[in-house]
Amino acid sequence: MAGRSILIIEDEPLIAMMLEDFVESLGHVPAGTADNIDDALDCVERGGFDLVILDVNLGARECWPIADRLAALSIPFILATGGHVSAPPAEHADAPTLPKPFTLDTVRDALENASVSERDIG
């Protein structure tokens, strides 16, 4: 899998920094971070990335407006999920997931699964 540009949408700064480190360690390029829905949607509209790691819970809100926009633009994303998360809406049920807590191996696996999903779609 060639190096990709990855946008990280995560509301916890330390987790976002850890994901940036993991992404770089795996040969990819962090394309930036966003920690809330409004900033994330602005980043999505600007573009400049190949893939998104998207935290399901962003503060008191869920990520579905962002996931909807990414899907409309055919931009692949991985849903980062923590403990008490409800099932995603049906239109995002097949999105690759990355369960918390993250490890380098689980991030690698999620990125590889996202690549496989893209090939299946394309």
Identify the meaning behind each predicted range:
Residues 59:
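The feature encodes the CheY-like receiver
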Residues 65, 72, 83-100, 109, ...:
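Alpha4 helix (beta4-alpha4-beta5 surface) of REC/receiver domains from two-component response regulators
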Residues 102-122:
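C-terminal output helix
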Residues 33-51:
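Acidic, metal-coordinating helix/loop segments flanking the phosphotransfer/catalytic sites
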Residues 78-81:
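Hydrophobic/aromatic residues positioned on beta-strands within the core alpha/beta folds
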Residues 10:
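Conserved acidic carboxylate
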Residues 55:
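Active-site residues of response regulator receiver
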Residues 13-32:
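Two-component/phosphorelay signaling modules centered on CheY-like receiver
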